[in-house]
């Protein structure tokens, strides 16, 4: 966090972030030239899949293909791909660990290039998907749509980096947060419309309790950690380790192994994997299985099979992705270099083994909590017989809670820095 002479730095940062978010939100509704949006809206009202495609990026029920329609999603996808490449390619992994600031700049540049490539892919998909909806569609119009949407995505990336650097909060996270929040009025309206006069008060109270438990569980999942205490060779407790993010003058240094190291990635990967069979079937490649999947037994047990698979895949992806985020071997090597060890555990192989065992237990607990929380929207839907609750998934709640917690921490940091500045001014 940069120290600033301006005592109103918190307000300035907040206004900058809000201004950029408002500008991006307005740009989402700035129509791309060449598209007859009146005809497009008429077509979309009758084709649910196209409505879903167009409204996915904007975060609500808009039917406008705007300059910032792609929003920050190309960058999010590029970041995920980059994380996987760093974990799979030894050269990139070594560059990230040993390259310092210059390496971070190189990886950021590669991520931006991936963002550009992914923007081209997504904008091309949108352009060709609109072919059936636009009478005036041609290759020139498709090219213009691709250029507009790709340019818009890169502008959004640039503005999000300005928020991260000079504003309040993390730019990409705030943009996703804004998209989710913008869809909440429609979600509330849908729930009220579907439930009016149909749902008993007891079901509402039970669902409210389940939602409260879900929010509490998400906060616990986001903030919960297992502290692995450390001891330095010189027995000094005045400063914390660079990677610990915290220190305790009574108990010494510690490594915070969080319950949910992988964030929402296990849910994203699980959803992507479970969509693949349906996608392949719709292409006509698995038509031979039609007699099997139309059996009454399969139809009745389909939801059970789906959610058991959902639960198991989240467990597996959580265990896998957590090893990418925190590698016990790398952590052990760093401790050895800094002449720091875990009390009662020998440095080297024994420390690596100990960290692996602790991480397995912590990650398994976090994965079980994440999988249980992921099924809660469906529990509420079953109680109320409403389809609207599936639109407010665990991923959205995790992002909402995570962004709020991050903003709270950053605001506290700015306030404390200003207090210290006043003390020594």
Swiss-Prot record:
InterPro entries: SecY, SecY/SEC61-alpha, SecY_CS, SecY_dom_sf. The chain crosses the membrane at residues 15-35, 62-82, 113-131, 139-159, 168-188, 201-221, 266-286, 304-324, 364-384, 385-405. Pfam families: SecY. Its main location: plastid. The keyword Isomerase does not apply. Component of the plastid Sec protein translocase complex, which is composed of at least SecY, SecE and SecG. Belongs to the SecY/SEC61-alpha family. This is Protein translocase subunit SecY.
């Amino acid at each position: 966090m940069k120290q600033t002479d301006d005592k109103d730095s918190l307000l300035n940062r907040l206004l900058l972030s809000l201004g950029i978010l408002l500008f991006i939100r307005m740009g989402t509704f700035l129509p791309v030239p060449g598209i007859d949006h009146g005809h497009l809206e008429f077509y979309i009202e009758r084709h649910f899949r196209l409505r879903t495609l167009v409204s996915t990026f904007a975060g609500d029920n808009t039917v406008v293909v705007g300059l910032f329609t792609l929003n920050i999603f190309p960058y999010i996808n590029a970041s995920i791909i980059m994380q996987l490449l760093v974990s799979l390619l030894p050269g990139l992994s070594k560059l990230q660990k040993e390259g310092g600031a210059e390496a971070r700049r190189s990886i950021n540049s590669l991520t931006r290039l991936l963002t550009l490539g992914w923007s081209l892919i997504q904008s091309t998909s949108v352009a060709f998907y609109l072919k059936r909806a636009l009478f005036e569609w041609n290759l020139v119009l498709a090219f213009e749509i691709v250029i507009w949407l790709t340019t818009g995505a890169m502008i959004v990336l640039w503005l999000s980096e300005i928020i991260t650097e000079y504003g309040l909060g993390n730019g990409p996270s705030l943009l996703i947060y804004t998209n989710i929040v913008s869809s909440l009025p429609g979600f509330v309206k849908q729930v009220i419309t579907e439930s009016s006069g149909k749902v008993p008060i007891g079901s509402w109270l039970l669902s409210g309790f389940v939602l409260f438990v879900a929010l509490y569980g998400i906060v616990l999942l986001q903030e919960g950690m297992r502290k692995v205490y450390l001891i330095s060779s010189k027995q000094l407790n005045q400063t914390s380790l660079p990677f610990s993010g915290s220190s305790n003058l009574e108990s010494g240094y510690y490594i915070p192994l969080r319950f949910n190291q992988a964030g929402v990635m296990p849910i994203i990967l699980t959803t992507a994997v479970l969509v693949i069979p349906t996608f392949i079937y719709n292409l006509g490649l698995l038509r031979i299985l039609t007699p099997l999947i139309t059996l009454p037994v399969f139809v009745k047990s389909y939801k059970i099979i789906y959610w058991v698979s959902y639960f198991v895949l989240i467990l597996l992806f959580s265990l896998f992705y957590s090893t990418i985020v925190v590698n016990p071997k790398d952590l052990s090597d760093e401790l050895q270099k800094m002449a720091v060890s875990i009390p009662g555990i020998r440095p080297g192989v024994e420390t690596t083994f100990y960290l692996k065992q602790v991480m397995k237990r912590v990650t398994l607990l976090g994965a079980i909590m994440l999988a249980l929380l992921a099924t809660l929207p469906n529990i509420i839907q079953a109680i109320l017989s409403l389809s609207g609750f599936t639109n407010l998934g665990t991923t959205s709640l995790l992002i909402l809670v995570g962004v709020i917690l991050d903003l709270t921490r950053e605001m506290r940091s700015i306030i404390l820095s200003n207090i210290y500045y006043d003390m020594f001014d």
